[in-house]
Amino acid sequence: GDKVDLIIQNKSTHADKRTAEGTMAAFFSNHKVGSFNVNHQGKRDESGFVIGILMTANGNFRVNCFFRKVQNKYVIHQIRIDKTDE
C-alpha cells in the first residue's frame, strides 16, 4: 500500500498507514494538543501543503504536511514535526 514519510523531531520513518497512525497516536498521547494555527497553505496541480504551529502542553511544534493527489483525492505524502520557539 501507500507509505508516508514521518519526520518527528529528527526521527525519520517511511511507514505504512497502520504504523504511521500508531506513531502519530504516540506523539499526541505525549503532547496534549492545545491548538493548531495554519501559517501557510497551498495547492498546485497534483500536490498541496499545510504549514502551521501546533501548541501542546509540552511546547510548540512546527508542522509541515505535504499532500499528493492519487486517483482524484489528496493523500498525505509527508508529515514533519519539529520543536520550535515560535
Residue ranges and their predicted role:
Residues 2-3, 33:
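Short, well-ordered coil loops that connect the C-terminus of an alpha-helix to the N-terminus
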Residues 8, 56, 70:
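Acidic surface patches and DE-rich sequence motifs
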Residues 13-20:
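Solvent-exposed, acidic/flexible segments
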Residues 60-86:
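Short beta-strand edge/turn micro-motifs at domain boundaries
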Residues 3-13:
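A short gly/proline-enriched turn/hairpin at secondary-structure junctions
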Residues 20-60:
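Surface-exposed, charged secondary-structure patches
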